[in-house]
Amino acid sequence: MFADLGYDIEEDKLGIPTVPGKVTLQKDAQNLIGISIGGGAQYCPCLYIVQVFDNTPAALDGTVAAGDEITGVNGRSIKGKTKVEVAKMIQEVKGEVTIHYNKLQADPKQGMSLDIVLKKVKHRLVENMSSGTADALGLSRAILCNDGLVKRLEELERTAELYKGMTEHTKNLLRAFYELSQTHRAFGDVFSVIGVREPQPAASEAFVKFADAHRSIEKFGIRLLKTIKPMLTDLNTYLNKAIPDTRLTIKKYLDVKFEYLSYCLKVKEMDDEEYSCIALGEPLYRVSTGNYEYRLILRCRQEARARFSQMRKDVLEKMELLDQEHVQDIVLQLQRFVSTMSKYYNDCYSVLRDADVFPIEVDLAHTTLAYGLSQDEFTDGEDEEDEDEEDTAAGEPPRDSRGAAGPLDKGGSWCNS
């Protein structure tokens, strides 16, 4: 466009250096090398690579990248040609084709502008919105917003809640079993003391046997605690290390994804701006000066897409391993728990079945005398009533009357009233 005015405009490279080079690519079965071309006459003084497609000769070779300028095909200059003419030149060559290029030495940090940062924030907000809400607010949703890994993250949160509940329940259960074992130990101590003090041999042996049974149950409880406690450690390891690590990886993946989507949206906006100017017939400065800003964004988009693909692959592998570990671990822990509980109850039943000593015959009178040797003779009050009746029959006042004090006479002696 500016050439029609009678003068040329120098390319505005934005301080980005370029390095010339050439690469020979072997075409695939469809006679393609796997690149898309942009720029060219009549609006842009140079032609450049817009995108390198995956699993194509250009992508597998890795020499050229998005944003690189194409200067020739098989030694023929393409200056002043349109992108359609250059595409035909490449298609006419069979087998191997040599591409001459100027490598764009771009720094991805140059493309990380405030606009990209704001777009990342917008994508974060739109991520958790429904389509209706986003449309009502006038926010566009990128194609990757409904990502399956986000749902996997929600499943991971539910799994974390499951493990947290199991951990708390196991802690409470272990605490209850510890208190129960201490109760059995106290029972054993009490019955052991009773058995030692019991004078009758048969009853003493029965109490001691019953005490030993409770002490055995206490040992079974301690063994259960030692067996199940590692289960609690494994659950905490999965809950506090594996799940947070995966959650952090997914958050990093989402950050890379939002960055890639931001560059895609930026490219779309710049394309729309260019098409609008072409439709109006007005020259666009950045296009007429080599479109280096657009090519920088193309390079940033390609690198962001590569990071996004690699991060997505890593997250999928980690999620798969975590799911397998979850299935295997939960089955192993539940089997350990059930087998330990079953063994505990079977052992308790076996011990109590062998300790079936009831009913126990105890001589209460003999036991009372044996336990009361160090105490005074026991009286129930009936003997005192008998003595009072005998004193009354002999003409003596009862003890209550004798013990009562009368008023004093004038001489200071006691008298009976």
Curated annotation (Swiss-Prot):
Q: Give membrane topology per the record.
A: Peripheral membrane protein; Lipid-anchor
Annotated region Disordered: where?
375-417
Residue span, PDZ domain? 22-105
One biological process GO term for this chain?
A: long-term synaptic depression
Q: Which UniProt keywords apply?
A: Actin-binding, Calcium, Cytoplasm, Cytoskeleton, Lipoprotein, Membrane, Metal-binding, Palmitate, Phosphoprotein, Synapse, Synaptosome, Zinc
Residues bound to Zn(2+) = 44, 46
Q: Where in the cell is it found?
A: Cytoplasm, Perinuclear region; Membrane; Postsynaptic density; Synapse, Synaptosome
- Modified sites of kind Phosphothreonine: 82
Q: Which residues form the signal peptide?
A: none
Q: Where is the AH domain?
A: 144-357
UniProt-listed InterPro entries: AH/BAR_dom_sf (IPR027267), AH_dom (IPR010504), Arfaptin_fam (IPR030798), PDZ (IPR001478), PDZ_sf (IPR036034), PICK1_BAR (IPR037959)
What is written about domains in the entry's comments? Answer: The AH domain mediates binding to F-actin.
Briefly state the protein's biological role: Probable adapter protein that bind to and organize the subcellular localization of a variety of membrane proteins containing some PDZ recognition sequence. Involved in the clustering of various receptors, possibly by acting at the receptor internalization level. Plays a role in synaptic plasticity by regulating the trafficking and internalization of AMPA receptors. May be regulated upon PRKCA activation. May regulate ASIC1/ASIC3 channel.
Assembly:
Monomer and homodimer. Interacts with CXADR. Interacts presynaptically with the glutamate receptors GRIA2, GRIA3, GRIK3, isoform 3 of GRIA4, isoform A of GRM4, GRM7 and GRM8; with NAPA and NAPB; and with BTG2. The interaction with NAPA and NAPB disrupts the interaction with GRIA2, conducting to the internalization of GRIA2.
Q: What is this protein called?
A: PRKCA-binding protein
User: What is the scientific name of the source organism?
Assistant: Bos taurus
